[in-house]
Amino acid sequence: MHILIYLAGAIVFFAMIMVSVALHEIGHLVPGKIFDVKTTQYMVGFGRTLWSRKRGETEYGIKAVPLGGYCKFIGMYPPDPGSGKLRTVRTGIFQSIADSARQAEWEDILPEDDGRLFYQKKTWQKLIIMFGGPTMNLILAFVTILIVSLSYGLPQSTAQVASVSECVIPIARQTSTDPAQRQCRPGDPQTPAVRAGLRDGDVITVFNGTRVTSWNQLSDLIRDNLDHEARITVRRGDQNVDLKPVHTVITGVESNTDPSKIVQAGFLGFSPAQQMVHGGPVFVVGQLWSMSEQLGNVIIRFPVRVYNTAANLVTGKQRDPNGPMSIVGASRIAGEVASTGDVNVSTKAAQMFLLLGTVNLSLALFNFVPLMPLDGGHIVGALYEAVKRWLARVFGRPDPGHADTAKMLPVAYVVGAVIGISGLILVVADVIDPIKPF
């Protein structure tokens, strides 16, 4: 029964991700149709077509490899300037790639398609079409996390002490992948929290004269204090207690934006308690912003972190629990959540929705990366064209025409290859050495 529940949870969650992908593509398709861009395909997945049906000029279908999707808009790349259509294909490797792509695309373009090609549309129309997909994922992330926030609550760290750390572990051992290295040893110094007399259950109300209103504020106060004196007041039961003044110490702590990165900052030595907080739209927007900061850092370092995942897979080292994963890994976590016996149904549903919201936020942010073939690359191309033509008008120069985004195809192929190889590495890692949620 445990295996069946696990499989059901993983399969259902995988299906929810694919629905998110389908809605992402609808975010492109609908404005494309509204602005009368010729659209020949709307596909969920890649590779061989499993099922399709044609309505009007557009073929709607599902493909064999469920790792994404696409809309095929005709006329993504403009013809060469002055040619009306194409020049003879040239021998330079990069120019040859661009010419070949243009030639392949123009073979499908008919005379009656004039005015309906993507590159011919106004800049604001192109931007709406390209922003549509990631925006759909942002909406899905907002809605799913709002549902969790209103019905179940979101976990928030507080200024209450959950547990006091006994020792200060040297940075060299903190960064070790061996859990035993991150345990206290004889000779490790006591934490400032122990020396100050901080206890489990205490609520820190004042830090160096500043009244504490949230965990984020308290965390920043401690980090910024470095190795200076700390005067702390706590609420213990129904009493306010001034603790013994101590100096915080400078040591390695997790980065606020990248938990996998250790930075040097002030350290007191305790773990904050968690509480479930219910909030509305404004609260959820704040949570999405905080999540975006962390996910953005992951995306910036994505190639490095994928390389580290591959290296750990080859060498047998423990995988970074905060590292990237594929949709296979996310589905496995959903299966673990669904099959956990000591968690009630409402908690499981909340965790699944929260995970789905996080995946959608990740998809949105990743697609905003300003490199082709991602949506962000096409957005940059449209903006570049608009700025170039605007500057020409301002300085009284001839209209430079459409931006030749086909010249960026070599970059698109490299980025596409990196994404494909990275995805394969993460899928293999998620099968062989999956990240454990519990």
Please report, for each region that a protein language model flagged, where it lies by residue.
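Residue-level signature of transmembrane alpha-helical entry/exit and packing/kink sites
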Residues: 5, 9-13, 121-130, 351-355
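Alpha-helical transmembrane segments of multi-pass membrane proteins
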Residues: 17-21, 137, 141, 359-367, ...
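PDZ-domain C-terminal substructure recognizer with occasional recognition of PDZ-binding tails
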Residues: 199, 205, 219-263
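Functional transmembrane alpha-helices
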Residues: 113-121, 168-170, 182, 254-364, ...
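Terminal peptide-recognition signature
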Residues: 24, 62, 193, 201-204, ...
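Conserved PDZ fold ligand-binding element
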Residues: 189-215
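Internal alpha-helical transmembrane segments
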Residues: 23, 34, 58, 69, ...
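Small-residue-rich helix-interface/hinge motifs
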Residues: 4-109, 113, 363-393
